[in-house]
Curated annotation (Swiss-Prot):
Induction behaviour: By cold exposure and repressed by heat exposure.
Cellular location(s): Mitochondrion matrix; Cytoplasm
Pfam assignment, any one: START
Keywords: Cytoplasm, Fatty acid metabolism, Hydrolase, Lipid metabolism, Mitochondrion, Phosphoprotein, Repeat, Serine esterase, Transit peptide
Organism lineage: Eukaryota, Metazoa, Chordata, Craniata, Vertebrata
Domain START: 370-582
Protein name: Acyl-coenzyme A thioesterase 11
Length: 594
């Protein structure tokens, strides 16, 4: 249906306006003049590093498959070299985001690892890694995993200020834009776990029959490693990948003690390096099964370091959580025994493992799946608010980064672009004589939108989630052909620029709340992705860009109003400009933090 609507719109616009031009320059590079060749044959990201390794028997586990520990060492090395190529100085691993392993790699196959810097901040940078396995005989290739790592540049005598990454391709622009939101998500991860345990009821099953349960203490593992020169990089610091490999080893032993079989690692929760380790350090690795679910188990691993045996104070180096399964001969997960945690700290870890499992499921659904697979309205609750906000902002930035927008019409310096891919999307653009911070403050409060947008009859603030996220209940007039007015429950996520050249962002998407069910009085509407991106255009000038990814409910309105679509959008946007000009002087006290 969407494709037919797209064809209808294309013919309608073509008959109304001629000489449509492709939008060639919608991006806003951060600094410098980018090379003329952005895509096509021969282009390669200047920070890209590739590694190819033939899997030998010495790299494998009992199943003849590549050891995940060995893979982590290769991943870390490749990513570090990419980071150092951009930084021009030594770099150390700060963290590694969640990794989901989709396929195993067998002896004789080739591992192809590709890493590139997505974005640089002040002294840290996000590196994206892609791992593909290759069968040389059949010439088939499989995606094994994707990973995101954070590296910190380090110089002995001076403070590092990294140069900015200038994205050129559509993929690079998307990753660059979303990297800031991912960084925000990493910083609040610990608080997310605490909030979930505080405000949500976690089913812990601690009262069930203990007779057939395995005591968690039976799975406890402790192992020590002496850091030798081969374990360290060219700076004398222990390889992050080597530490991760040691952690995977003790975690596998702990998992095996629960299931009395050979487990398979399926996912790794975020690695976060809290401090460095050098040659000569003794690393103490501790692992224990925190919780066992029906077909999977979570193992917690902790790494501490000390220099001399006489030292009483150990340094906390790293912690991580790993998810294991036990596969049968058909590669299907087997049922696992229940685990009985120790009172006190053991029960705390048990409940936190349940909370992390819920977060993983929410995150995997919201972040990992394709946009077309996500429901228009996703249930909102404290356990997934961080990832809903992330998906809200990243969806808008992904739409913004598209490079095949087509200019449909321009009326008095208001431009309307359309994009026909999986969804039909619209983009309006104008420049206003108002400072970007003022525009951001005025447009981010949806309660003021009825002052200029006739499609918003009333707006109620339902919940102020945090300083930058809020949920609103919106009432809109009835669309043509309908007798009922529409209502929406909308999550609004606003973001200030992370760096020079970044836009202010106001992202909107529908959510569902238990306090605001559908009612007979209104027809429930939904929006998948819409919002504003605001760029500074010189002194007191702002480029205002509005994006909307049309949903099925909106498509009917579009198809029945093709002839008046452009003029109505123009009138609404000009009303927005008048609203901004009339109210720009009312915000001086509130702009201090922007």
């Amino acid at each position: 249906m969407i494709q037919n609507v797209g064809n209808h719109l294309r013919r309608g616009f073509a008959s109304m306006f001629s000489n449509r031009t492709s939008r060639k320059s919608i991006s806003h590079p951060e600094s410098g003049d980018p090379p003329t060749m952005a895509e096509g044959e021969g282009y390669r990201n200047p920070t890209e590093v590739q590694m190819s390794q033939l899997v030998l028997p010495c790299h494998t586990n009992h199943r003849g498959e590549l050891s995940i520990g060995q893979l982590l060492k290769w991943i870390d090395t490749t990513a570090c070299l990419s980071a150092e190529r951009h930084a021009g100085c030594p770099c150390v691993t700060a963290s590694m985001d969640d990794i989901y392993f989709d396929h195993t790699i067998s002896v004789g196959q080739v591992v192809n690892i590709k890493a590139k810097v997505n974005r640089a901040f002040n002294s840290s940078m996000e590196v994206g890694i892609q791992v593909v396995s290759e069968d040389l005989c059949s010439e088939k290739q499989w995606s094994v995993c994707k990973a995101l790592a954070t590296f910190v540049a380090h110089r002995e005598l001076s403070k590092v200020k990294l140069k900015q990454v200038i994205p050129l391709t559509e993929e690079e622009k998307t990753e660059h834009g979303v990297a800031a939101e991912r960084r925000r998500m990493r910083l609040v991860y610990a608080d997310t776990i605490k909030d979930l345990l505080t405000h949500c009821v976690i089913q812990d099953d601690l009262d069930k029959d203990c007779s057939n349960m395995v005591p968690a203490e039976k799975t406890r593992v402790e192992s020590v490693e002496l850091v030798l020169p081969p374990h360290a990089n060219h700076q004398g610091n222990t390889f992050g990948g080597q530490i991760m490999a040691w952690m995977e080893n003790v975690a596998t032993i702990a998992a095996s003690r629960l299931c009395h079989a050979h487990p398979t690692l399926k996912a790794i929760e975020m690695f976060h390096f809290r401090g460095p380790s050098q040659v000569g350090d003794r690393l103490v690795l501790k692992a224990i099964v925190n919780n066992a679910f029906k077909h999977s188990m979570e193992v917690g691993v902790c790494v501490e370091a000390y220099r001399q045996e006489a030292e009483t104070q150990r340094r906390h180096i790293n912690s991580a959580f790993m998810t294991f399964v036990v596969l049968d001969k058909d590669d299907q997960p087997q049922k696992l025994p229940w685990i009985r945690p120790q009172p006190g700290e053991g029960e705390r870890r048990y409940r936190e493992a349940s909370a992390r499992k819920k977060i993983r499921l929410d995150r995997k659904y919201l972040v990992s799946c394709k946009q077309a697979e996500v429901a228009l309205s996703v249930p909102w609750d404290p356990s997934n608010q961080v990832y809903l906000s992330y998906y809200n902002v990243s969806s808008l930035k992904t739409l913004m980064a598209k490079d095949n927008w087509v200019l449909s019409v321009e009326i008095s310096e208001v431009r309307l672009y359309i994009l026909e891919e999986d969804f039909l999307s619209f983009h309006l653009e104008m420049v206003v004589n108002v400072d970007a911070a003022q525009v951001f403050q005025l447009l981010s409060d949806l309660r003021r939108r009825p002052e200029w947008d006739k499609h918003y009859r009333s707006v109620e603030l339902v919940q102020q989630v945090d300083e930058d996220d809020a949920i609103y209940h919106v009432i809109s007039p009835a669309l043509s052909g309908n007798t009922k007015p529409q209502d929406f429950v909308i999550l609004a996520s606003r973001r200030k620029p992370c760096d020079n050249g970044d836009p202010y962002v106001i992202a909107l998407r529908s959510v569902t709340l238990p306090t605001h069910h559908e009612t007979p009085e209104y027809q429930r509407g939904e929006t998948l992705c819409s919002g504003f991106c605001l760029w500074r255009e010189g002194d007191q000038m702002t480029k205002v860009s509005y994006y909307n990814q049309a949903t099925p409910g909106f498509l009917n309105y579009v198809t029945t109003n093709v002839s008046g679509l452009s003029s109505e959008f123009y009138n609404t946007f000009k009303a927005c400009e008048s609203f901004l000009l009339d109210n720009r002087n009312d915000l001086a006290p509130s702009l201090q933090t922007l």
